[in-house]
Amino acid sequence: MRHFGTVSPAALTVDDVEFKSLYRKTEYEAQTADGWTLVLTRYQPVPRPFAQPIFGEPLLLVHGACQNRHAWTSGQFVKNLLFFGADIHILELRGHGKSSVDLQRRRAAEADRPPPADLEWGWDIDSYFLQDLPAAVAAVKSLTKRDKIFFCGHSMGGMLGYGYAGLHDDFEGIVTIGASSELGKGFPILKAIALAEPGLAAAIDVALAAANLREAVGRRAGKATSMALARIGAKELAGALEPRAAWSPRTFRYLPVDEWIRWVDTAFTKKSYERFRTLSAFLTILANPSRATSSDVRWLMRHGVEREPRRVIAQFARWIRNGELACYRTGYDFAEGFPRISVPMAIIFGDLDKLASMESTAGIYRAARSEYLLWRPVKGNSHLELTMGHDIRQICYDIKNLVDFAVKHRGRRPSLPRIEDEGSARR
């Protein structure tokens, strides 16, 4: 980093500026109609002596499945956008990060009211779409006193944005990163997994039921034997056979991705990361290790991964099996709203990404009616590193350009100069 005072403002780059000098950080809450308290983290830009072309423009960031706010903060995504002056608001969906299950219990106790009905991992993608995203949009608009805001979603967050933008007029521009509009298209392995999901879920339920039955029978037998031994005076042996800890039956309520990743992290050293990079050409379904640093990846593994409810996974599988993105509670098919999207839009994906590829994002690109419409791959990228890898700077430039375009054309449609007649073109 060059010393700030030795570089003219016009020549400054984001690398010349300290991250913490770009913002004031606060947190605030949004209340959903079904009783959840969601936390948003705001990075409010501060004026600096260099160009900030989108200063103060509110931008809502929404993470993907099994993630939290650190999907955006584990690399330099937020810093790059702050350098341009964006007013960043990061939503954490219910059960993720600071919008945790524990927070709901605390808020319910403080208000002397029951916690949300779906608190014990009973929500699905419809909950994110019908409750969380509308509450967050309303909160950002209220705090910034804006009628419209900008939106950026990664993976599932981008899919929610597709559906929302087709129904509502709250976005002045929308950016999606690694967000498929036809999930599973061109990815037969994912389709096979989705087809198997109902059977796999049922098998897990049966296995857990059998384990619970064995445990219950064993505990009852131990209790009965302990009582019998106590009656004949064998108290020491009776105490050894008495079931110790309280027990509750095990159920399949969520996918414990956080626990899996912690297990992986124990064997994840810089040396093993470099070894993994040499094999990455064959293992780029979720990430391409060559496009991110080992420290950023490990930090994200430790802080940015969350468990996801079973119902969310089941809804993803249903989307893939049916070839649709839909809100099943209302019957709304997201694709029906694609032609109603006319605001500036950027659809960005990794050229190695199997989850959101050119094939699986083509539907939204072809259906949207935006005059400013960007659809492009990021070379060498897969899925996760799009928000924290080596190439985020070019993505942030795309976001800046979209916001700048929308701001400059508020209240008027963009138009190119028109040539009056052929003669004027030759003069």
What are the roles of these predicted feature ranges?
Residues 142, 146, 156-325:
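Alpha/beta-hydrolase-fold enzymes
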Residues 13-47:
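N-terminal cap/lid segment of alpha/beta-hydrolase-fold proteins
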Residues 110-141:
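Alpha/beta-hydrolase active-site loop
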Residues 381-394:
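Catalytic histidine-centered segment of alpha/beta-hydrolase-like enzymes
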Residues 341, 347-349, 353:
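Short beta-strand/loop motif that positions the catalytic acidic residue
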Residues 45-102:
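Short, surface-exposed "cap/lid" segments of acyl-processing enzymes
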